[in-house]
């Protein structure tokens, strides 16, 4: 999960839509932008989805403004089971993803990124 506090002038953050287009993420003062990781999709049975995102030189706003990013990445223990949270299932609904360990999930993501490159 990434939580961003952005100014209106900073711009440049884009998210990819399900149909493959890149769109600017609109921000307002006092609001946060939250990007979720792929494991959150599995935990929530796609109620919360991971969005591919990128940062580009802004077309509007102050492209020369200063930015500061602090990344902090947290990952469950390698052998932790990742499965749908029961409260994310409606009556009669089944999980869309099989249970997997966090380590196996990350291994598959790394393999997929190498195949795509």
Which positions does each model-derived feature cover?
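C-terminal flanking tails of non-heme Fe-dependent oxygenases
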Residues: 1-117
